Swiss-Prot record:
The keyword Isomerase applies. It comes from Homo sapiens. It catalyses: GDP-beta-L-fucose + NADP(+) = GDP-4-dehydro-alpha-D-rhamnose + NADPH + H(+). Keywords: Isomerase, Multifunctional enzyme, NADP, Oxidoreductase. GO terms for molecular function: electron transfer activity; GDP-4-dehydro-D-rhamnose reductase activity; GDP-L-fucose synthase activity; GDP-mannose 3,5-epimerase activity; identical protein binding. It comes from the Eukaryota. SUPFAM superfamilies: NAD(P)-binding Rossmann-fold domains (SSF51735). This is GDP-L-fucose synthase. Coiled coil: none annotated. It holds the Pfam family Epimerase. Substrate binds at residues 194, 208, 215, 277. It is an enzyme of class 1 (oxidoreductase).
């Protein structure tokens, strides 16, 4: 009681992951404002698939604002195998977080979606209006539908209670504290780990697939700044895509070259074309973001890759891999 009118207590779920750690760093480096109290929690603090534990956490923290990053995630092959688990765990977690936020009277919730939720058959570039236009890719339908339901639930909280519960849709995020597991991580951290191993063993680097698919990569520290902007300034319930522009899309081959350059690797680079390429592209439009923030400057891709490679090398023992 007696808190000044502008004060905010922000609870960040999934606080130990890639994006959570980036928000923590950006806040510590000066993005936090006076009157803001940031609380970062991870699965060690509460099992968010458990309603009672989630409610107890929210009762204890009493957040005015929530950034919901926690999710059960995995690479392509784990998704294919465990679609039911990805659906159930994420649906339980999301419902528990959103409803606990509602029950403690949180003024705003910003959840994190993913571009994989978009319809498999679509036109490009993808934009925020297309989320529910058709089924997602069959490989990870459990995860994708669970994430889509956050948007459905946000709209229902707004319609029934006027809540400002919204969501952001980042493209391919990378940066320090990523999961650098080669089998189960995403493409860029997997490449960084592979180059590190090839360099230390003096062997060739093998990139899976043709190297032709194209992706929009966003640096986790840029995404963290945008998350904080959304939390403070973005008041729509409709989601917003957080991404570099369409012109900044890079091929997997170009991404591999950036990692090779950043890590000063001089060995042979080969492409294993027996491995699947996945979707050729998932180009997303950031024109909605640009109408709000025309001057936001993203970290240049090569610089962000360099910083991430340096972090991985310096923290090799502790890094998730």
């Amino acid at each position: 009681m007696g808190e000044p009118q502008g004060s905010m207590r922000i609870l960040v779920t999934g606080g130990s992951g890639l994006v959570g750690k980036a928000i923590q760093k950006v806040v510590a480096d000066g993005a936090g404002l006076p009157g803001e109290d940031w609380v970062f929690v991870s699965s060690k603090d509460a099992d968010l698939t458990d309603t009672a534990q989630t409610r107890a956490l929210f009762e204890k923290v009493q957040p005015t604002h929530v950034i919901h990053l926690a999710a059960m995630v995995g690479g392509l092959f784990r998704n294919i195998k465990y679609n039911l688990d990805f659906w159930r765990k994420n649906v339980h977690m999301n419902d528990n977080v959103l409803h606990s936020a509602f029950e403690v009277g949180a003024r705003k919730v910003v959840s994190c979606l993913s571009t994989c939720i978009f319809p498999d058959k679509t036109t490009y570039p993808i934009d925020e209006t297309m989320i529910h236009n058709g089924p997602p890719h069959n490989s990870n339908f459990g995860y994708s539908y669970a994430k889509r339901m956050i948007d459905v639930q946000n709209r229902a909280y707004f319609q029934q209670y006027g809540c400002t519960f919204t969501a952001v849709i980042p493209t391919n995020v990378f940066g320090p504290h990523d999961n650098f597991n080669i089998e189960d991580g995403h493409v860029l951290p997997g490449l960084i780990h592979k180059v590190h191993l090839a360099k230390s063993s003096g062997s060739a680097l093998t990139v899976w697939g043709t190297g032709n698919p194209r992706r929009q990569f966003i640096y986790s520290l840029d995404l963290a700044q945008l998350f904080i902007w959304v939390l403070r300034e973005y008041n729509e319930v409709e989601p917003i895509i957080l991404s570099v522009g369409e012109e900044d899309e890079v091929s997997i081959k170009e991404a591999a070259e950036a990692v090779v350059e950043a890590m000063d690797f001089h060995g042979e680079v080969t492409f294993d074309t027996t491995k699947s390429d996945g979707q050729f592209k998932k180009t997303a439009s950031n024109s909605k973001l640009r109408t709000y923030l025309p001057d936001f400057r993203f970290t240049p891709f090569k610089q962000a890759v360099k910083e991430t490679c340096a972090w991985f090398t310096d923290n090799y023992e502790q890094a998730r891999k």
